[in-house]
Amino acid sequence: MQCPNQNHMLVNRAMVVAALDSFEDARRIISGVLDLSRLTNTSVKGQHTNDTNYFSRYSNFFSQMPAIILNQLKCCIKAQVDDAVKMVLQKAKKVEVSKPVEKMLTFTTLNTYLGYPESTGCVMEYTEEQSGPIAAKLLITLLSSTLNAMVRPKSDPNISQNKIPRHYYQLKVHVGAQKKVNLTAIEVIRGCQHECSVVYCEFVRYSAYFAGLYDDQVAAILLYAVAAHNVQGFGARFCVLWALMCVRIAGFADDINIYIKHRGMSGLLPQLVEMKCLLGRGVNEIDVETEARRRLDVGSLSMQRLDENELRAAVRLIYSEELRRPVTYPLICDFWSSRWLWAANGSHSRALEHAHPELATRKEGQAYRKAVMEQWQHNPMDRWDGTVYVTPSAKLEHGKTRLLLACDTLSYMWFEYALRPVERIWENSNVILDPGSMGNCGIATRINGWRNGMPGQSFFAVDYDDFNSQHTLMSQKIVFEELFHHIGYNASWVKTLVDSFDSMELWIKGKCAGIMAGTLMSGHRATSFINSVLNRAYIICAGGHVPTSMHVGDDILMSCTLGHADNLIANLNRKGVRLNASKQVFSKTSGEFLRVAHREHTSHGYLARVISSAVSGNWVSDHTLNQQEALMNAIVCCRGILNRSLPGEKNPVVRVISRSVSKRTKIEEKTIRLLLSGRACLKGGVVYGEQTNYIQVYRINCRVERSEEKLPPYRHATEDYLNNHLADIEVMAVRQYGSDIADIMAQASWKKSMSTEGAEDVSRLSLQRDKTLPCLHCITEKETSLLPVRYGLFSSYPILMMLKDRIPIKEALKLAVTIGYRPQPNSDLELDLWGESNNSCAIEGVLPYNEATSLAQKLPCGGVVIQVIHNVYV
């Protein structure tokens, strides 16, 4: 038999067209029954209309589809239809009802759950029936029965005969698809074949419909099916067909996503939303240059029309709520000389160098800011004239591509200087600049506080349309003018910084294309700050000021009445603020914030999002994960998949992907399975499971093989830091244990840049079985969250922390004594000095991995079981 021909498969247009026809038929039925066009029309009109003709619509669509679909829907509502029949019989005093009456009652009951509320306003409030468990069950039944009936099995001979090469499915053109993916289709297929036969059989049965899909999409579809097929009775066939349909017809995935979220059912059906993510990165490409040039013409931009005085008053109110302590700025020379410590390692734009040749840096590979600052010997900040150099590129997100407008390193430095002291003392009352510090548990606690303290109100999530593009330059200037006015700061550089919004030059292909006429640059240092402040400011200007609201970037969740929400949306529309009308979610039971649906007793992340991340990896930089990074990434991603689908041993995801992770990390597959499943953990990590009696801990041994190629000779940032910012205790530590500290610091700065040139150090990973901790104590997650974060005495000495592994604990104690430390009897020196307890604990319940490990670090000892009261399936 001939080898399978990849090209033959990919050009088999008849196969692809047939697949689309089957899924389009299914889409037409589902969209008709659910009246999905009503929601998309709402996006255009901005106002809801009543649906009084559901009976004829149901009659029309159900007459065109196989009878089994309606019969299965009837099974879901049999009790409700029987009750309706009894009421009719009692009123009419008859023994049985006629077929037309029974049909009418069935359709009326269906509409009670799947229909829409009577509303003519901007915001729709669904009944408990329309957003409850029965409605969710009906939706699953409609989707599954329609797909089973309309999509006939059709297999690819190459798949059914188990003769497929490694790259049977085409890779995307982007370099990330070639080098950065974590899982390939063949790895997931083989994993299913050996460890999840029920999904593998369905894949073979419908394999012809996978023709023409990209490798990462096939991997994502199958991994989704592996994770979800045991959830809520979905079944493997439904999961495969549902994921296939959402990838084949991305517009339908959007429609169902809106339908579920609009009803506040995303917490009931988190496995069905955001399915468009399975398309992966590098899809729906945009014309970057055209999109960027559009921002040069104010006439082509659609920005808000808020009154300037109203906006200023709103911004002032925000600062009065969030900035209640004085802001102090360091000397600019000290800020500059400490750049090794604070510089983020984002991409460096060459546009700055075209305009200022004196700031030119080495041209090899992609430049990153930490490496650039090692090359700049003299401080360029005092010569800044306020010009911002903007370069456009495509930001490849899951399921879509956005325009990224990156700003230069010099402007980044100035806005870092301006904002860092402000962000440190920000209250995070309503405008939240650091949601990570709260975590999903903290957000859930705050939302439940609203739920209990504001009876009669509901959760309202406002959805802006392309929020960055709605900000005028004046509104961005107001954010900073009012900021400096509030903190009473009027240094000479303040005006330059504020005026810089009028001097943003767009650079394309090494040439200046013009001055930006409006919109917020998505790669500006202040993007998140500006968005978050203006987010709440626009709401205040529209009469939406409530104490119970949270704003992060373009995300909003508040607690209010229906009348308040309706008035708010109407006012925002009048003031020119663009909204996605069909995505305004008003719900009594569920509030979505930062892509997590929070219900009263549980919070839910969306499965498709973590599946796509687990498959595709990060395409932002060329840096390839080393073995240790790959292991940690696999543990976090796998825990996310387990939490969002089926936590526990019954989920075959761990077994399906363990061989691939073992191959990448060079760790024995048996050990990998223990770590991915949460039955064992790395030192300082957590295990998961009910009735855990002990914790098995593994210690990482990582041997680094230094690259033969030497680092570039530039290390000005390193030298400036060592010459100006070492404390006496750090000087002593460097003399004894850090003669090569400059090399270590420079390596940290250059690591990301050198990885793009193939000159990165190689890490060889091995794991050693460490101690087994008995579980002797128990504490709730809420009690743990109230414990203070334990900072070590040395935590404020970054160079000392870099040398931690070299300094024996007895010598560390001697250093600590020089700055006043006095050990107490039974002191935990590791914890007191370094602040790192490396405590491993057990999680009884469901928590995201990173939040669980953060809680573990608050505990005074290991071997503790943390009981989760509010499960967070993220």
Curated annotation (Swiss-Prot):
GO terms for molecular function: hydrolase activity; nucleotide binding; RNA binding; RNA-directed RNA polymerase activity. Coiled coil: none annotated. GO terms for biological process: DNA-templated transcription. Its EC number is 2.7.7.48. Pfam families: RdRP_4. It comes from the Viruses. Keywords: Hydrolase, Nucleotide-binding, Nucleotidyltransferase, RNA-binding, RNA-directed RNA polymerase, Transferase, Viral RNA replication. It is an enzyme of class 2 (transferase). Belongs to the totiviridae RNA-directed RNA polymerase family. This is Probable RNA-directed RNA polymerase.
